[in-house]
């Protein structure tokens, strides 16, 4: 976040005499004029150019203090009343902010238990057919005669009579207000009270092999909040201790990694015994403490090997059975898919050549080996953008590389698929970046796009400080035409900002990065996903309200203000302050803004989306006929016939001087991925990604 603060009443605004700064020129310090403002107060030798140069790039959807787990948005919370963890059922103790609470479903939990929540947030929309994965609770209003705590939020069920509801099937007790946010997973064990262990067990003949890999979410046994765990493996019962084997002790750790292997030569008398796995806490001065256990019969091990996570149980329970860790939602959804697959026995899935685009032959398929990666020219949360030269040609491309493991772990499979679909649209205006092709390897997705030599507008704003109104109009017109195209096809962009507006070699606009875009959103059809870049997000997004394509026009108004003022209309030291200002403050304009500029920006920055310019059915007509664009020939603009005010300086074919040094100094090496994770990755999730754009090939 840029080092900016919202000025208090009485802060100075830019005087009307300040001209637009030329590259390298110094703008006079603010302070020559006085008046109320919501702008950054610039004093001393500071100026707009230096402010823009020091401004940091902001990524989309970066929220501090939040943990995203299975759709839950866990924020740090101070609990005033006695509260129990909804995962491990222990008391949430401590001073200050003791635990986490989901902002969607109010699920309370220890910070240490947060990452072990296996069910999806009931308050968040899911993409799959949720009705097929529901096992609903049977709630009955109940009067409790003893103190009882809510199994959802962890607070006391208060009152004299009918304090809460109880599930007649699984005995879950919750508040009346909490029953709507309880996940529909009646009967499913979704907690790991004692932790879990990852292991592999295989029985071949009389040889039993046990691989102890790692444990997680173990219970703290020492006063320092940690444990000193080790794993004990033996055949049970075994009073002599003949078969007992132990791993090394991992000190002060609740998530130890062991990676040890044990082998057993089974005797005939062992055939009726069970393989017992226990976790113990080692103590130097006293007796070791039991932490958890589970066991397997040799009969079940003979049928098939055991490979995966298993929950630790109590000492009595662990001697008799085991419980595998499963994602209940995904497990039911998997069974649903298997049933649907069985209903269509004659429908054969296309599994061969799944990396090959559907509209080209195998001989012409694009591969990563076809390119020489020259420089890094961009970077995001999922991957990076590389300048690439196609081998054997003079063709230069911008190749966006995304890691599959990051996409899967963040449950964002729809993002690259949406981006590919939008980049492949036909009849697109010249102000949307063109895609040459997209392909995949075992661990990455690749978008091959046209190379925009001029860099992004963030870089150019850092050089100029701010633009004259005529320059701002030029860029606003070309960006608006790109948005018209998307909105007329029911696509909301959701990430309009300086970083995502590139210039080609002539200086015309190219809108890039459609990862957050979504189809099926109109002026009436809404969506609720909280996403975007903080300074550009509309009030309805910040408030978690349903929003439509009108949210894009709010971002457009912020962008227009930024063009001419050299800063965003709503600043703050952190996201919380920025969001509060977006919802409550009004934009205050520098004195050099024209009446038409203030009018159109005010119309775009209307808090109520239904009253916002661009929100109605006639958005194109209302925007193009506004007095701010009175001198614009929109037909010439759409034909790319307007003269760009800034022509990028390009010294040679591979010149990257128009890109941020923070990117170009990085190595082009691709970050290694987790090989074990990639081996278990279902590549079927990416079938249909690869594509060759016939329109781009025609241009070449």
Curated annotation (Swiss-Prot):
Pfam families: C1_1, C2, Pkinase, Pkinase_C. Tetrapeptide ligand at C-terminus is tethered to inaD by interaction with the second PDZ domain. It is an enzyme of class 2 (transferase). SMART domains: C1 (SM00109), C2 (SM00239), S_TK_X (SM00133), S_TKc (SM00220). InterPro entries: AGC-kinase_C, C1-like_sf, C2_dom, C2_domain_sf, DAG/PE-bd, Kinase-like_dom_sf, PE/DAG-bd, Pkinase_C. Keywords: ATP-binding, Calcium, Kinase, Metal-binding, Nucleotide-binding, Phosphoprotein, Repeat, Sensory transduction, Serine/threonine-protein kinase, Transferase, Vision, Zinc, Zinc-finger. This is Protein kinase C, eye isozyme. Ca(2+) 3 binds at residues 283, 286, 289. It comes from the Eukaryota. The active site is at residue 495. Its cofactor is Ca(2+). Residues 371-629 form the Protein kinase domain. Binds 3 Ca(2+) ions per C2 domain. A zinc finger (Phorbol-ester/DAG-type) spans 71-121, 136-186. Residues 630-700 form the AGC-kinase C-terminal domain. Residues 189-310 form the C2 domain. One of its GO terms (cellular component) is inaD signaling complex. Signal peptide: none annotated. It catalyses: L-seryl-[protein] + ATP = O-phospho-L-seryl-[protein] + ADP + H(+); L-threonyl-[protein] + ATP = O-phospho-L-threonyl-[protein] + ADP + H(+).
């Amino acid at each position: 976040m840029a080092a900016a603060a919202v000025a208090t009443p009485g802060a100075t605004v830019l005087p009307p005499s300040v001209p637009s700064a030329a590259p390298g020129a110094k703008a006079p310090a603010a302070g020559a004029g006085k008046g109320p403002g919501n702008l950054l107060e610039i004093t001393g030798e500071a100026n707009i150019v230096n402010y823009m140069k020091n401004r940091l790039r902001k990524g989309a959807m970066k929220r501090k203090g939040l943990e995203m787990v299975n759709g839950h948005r866990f924020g740090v919370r101070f609990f005033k009343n006695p509260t129990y963890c909804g995962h491990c059922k222990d008391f949430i103790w401590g001073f200050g902010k003791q635990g986490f609470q989901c902002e969607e479903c109010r699920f309370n939990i220890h910070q240490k238990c947060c990452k072990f929540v296996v069910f999806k947030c009931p308050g968040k929309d899911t993409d799959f057919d949720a009705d097929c994965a529901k096992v609903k609770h049977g709630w009955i209003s109940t009067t409790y005669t003893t103190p009882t705590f809510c199994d959802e939020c962890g607070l006391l069920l208060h009152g004299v009579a009918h304090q809460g509801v109880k599930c007649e099937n699984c005995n879950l007790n919750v508040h009346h207000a909490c029953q709507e946010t309880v996940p529909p997973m009646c009967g499913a064990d979704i907690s790991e009270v004692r932790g879990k262990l990852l292991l592999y067990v295989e029985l071949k003949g009389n040889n039993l092999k046990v691989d102890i890999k790692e444990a997680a979410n173990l219970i703290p046994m020492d006063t320092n909040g940690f444990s000193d765990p080790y794993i004990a493996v033996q055949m049970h019962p075994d009073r002599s201790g003949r078969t007992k084997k132990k791993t090394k002790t991992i000190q002060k750790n609740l998530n130890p990694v062991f990676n040890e292997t044990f082998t057993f030569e089974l005797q005939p008398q062992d055939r009726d015994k069970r393989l017992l796995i226990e976790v113990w806490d080692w103590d130097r001065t006293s007796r070791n403490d039991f932490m958890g256990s589970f066991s397997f019969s040799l009969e079940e091990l003979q049928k098939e090997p055991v490979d995966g996570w298993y929950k630790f149980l109590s000492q009595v329970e662990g001697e008799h059975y085991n419980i595998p860790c499963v994602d209940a939602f995904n497990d039911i959804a998997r069974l649903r898919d298997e049933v649907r697959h069985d209903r269509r026995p004659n429908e054969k899935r296309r599994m061969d050549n799944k990396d090959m685009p559907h509209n080209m032959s195998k001989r012409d398929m694009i591969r990563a080996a076809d390119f020489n990666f020259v420089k890094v020219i961009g970077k995001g949360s999922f991957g990076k953008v590389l300048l690439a030269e196609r081998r054997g040609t003079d063709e230069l491309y911008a190749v966006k590389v995304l890691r599959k493991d990051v996409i899967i772990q963040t449950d964002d499979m729809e993002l690259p698929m949406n981006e590919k679909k939008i980049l492949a649209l036909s009849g697109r205006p010249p102000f949307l970046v063109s895609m040459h092709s997209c392909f995949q390897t075992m661990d990455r997705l690749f978008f091959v796009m046209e190379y925009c030599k001029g860099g992004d507008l963030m870089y150019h704003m850092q050089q100029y400080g701010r633009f004259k109104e005529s320059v701002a109009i030029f860029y606003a017109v070309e960006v608006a035409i790109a948005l018209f195209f998307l909105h007329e096809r029911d696509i909301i962009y959701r990430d309009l900002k300086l970083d995502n507006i590139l210039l080609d070699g002539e200086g015309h606009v190219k809108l890039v990065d459609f990862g957050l875009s979504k189809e099926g959103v109109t002026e009436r059809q809404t969506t609720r996903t909280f996403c975007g870049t903080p300074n550009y997000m509309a009030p309805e997004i910040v408030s978690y309200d349903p929003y439509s394509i009108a949210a894009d026009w709010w971002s457009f108004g912020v962008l227009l203000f930024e063009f001419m003022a050299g800063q965003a209309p709503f600043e703050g030291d952190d996201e919380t302050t920025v969001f509060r200002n977006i919802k409550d403050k009004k934009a205050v304009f520098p004195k050099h803004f024209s009446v038409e500029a203030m009018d159109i920006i005010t119309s775009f920055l209307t808090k109520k989306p239904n009253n916002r310019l661009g929100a109605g059915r006639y958005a194109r007509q209302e925007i193009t006929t506004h007095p701010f664009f009175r001198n614009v020939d929109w037909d010439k603009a759409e034909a790319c016939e307007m003269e760009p005010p800034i022509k990028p300086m390009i010294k040679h074919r591979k010149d990257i001087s128009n890109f941020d040094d923070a990117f170009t100094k990085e190595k082009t090496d691709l970050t290694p991925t987790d090989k074990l994770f990639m081996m278990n990755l279902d590549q079927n999730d990416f079938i249909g990604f690869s594509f060759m754009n016939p329109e781009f090939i025609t241009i070449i």
